[in-house]
Design a protein with these regions (language model features):
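Gly/Ser/Thr/Pro-rich low-complexity, intrinsically disordered segments
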Residues: 1-161
Length: 161
């Protein structure tokens, strides 16, 4: 389903919640992807990890997340002047998820948000951009990460089984 890849938490920045348990306490910076017990995705700024667990957060993902769509409304925070390679996740009312990976430099968050809305997504977040935009299938990388050194190491990942 969805899982946090954080195993060695000594260098973790911000907050870490795994399976509803606070692993690194602190205050959310608003750029973590939150996965609630009911499967809803979102972000929250200025909230302690303990309070997020009380609100039903099951996992946090450290991914420089920006909420593009919240409860069917396009969020004004997604507007940005540049286009980047990026990965985004959207969620429909029936709980289905869509993952998009933009491999070119022609898409802004606004166009990706509109695309996810056209698929019926009522919540959507960008996850990260640049060299961390790595798409795999059956353990094989199927895109070309943009950093000159190849894939960028990241502390978290999403996977679907």
């Amino acid at each position: 389903y969805l899982s946090s890849g954080q195993e060695d938490l000594r260098g973790a920045n911000g907050i870490v919640i795994v399976d509803g348990q606070v692993k690194v306490d602190g205050v959310s910076g608003g750029q973590e992807l939150l996965l609630y017990k009911d499967g809803t995705i979102g972000t929250a700024a200025g909230v302690s990890a303990s309070e997020l667990v009380n609100r039903g957060v099951k996992y946090t993902f450290s991914c420089h997340s920006t909420q593009m769509i919240q409860n069917g409304d396009t969020s004004p925070s997604y507007r940005e002047p540049k286009s980047y390679k990026r990965t985004c996740i959207g969620q429909t009312t029936n709980g289905d998820y869509y993952i998009t990976t933009d491999l070119g430099y022609g898409n802004k968050l606004s166009s990706t948000a509109e695309y996810l809305k056209s698929l019926g997504c009522v919540n959507a977040n960008s996850l990260d951009q640049g060299g961390s935009v790595t798409l795999t299938r059956n353990s094989e990388v199927i895109n070309n990460p943009s950093d000159s050194s190849g894939e960028r190491y990241v502390g978290d990942f999403l996977y679907f089984v």
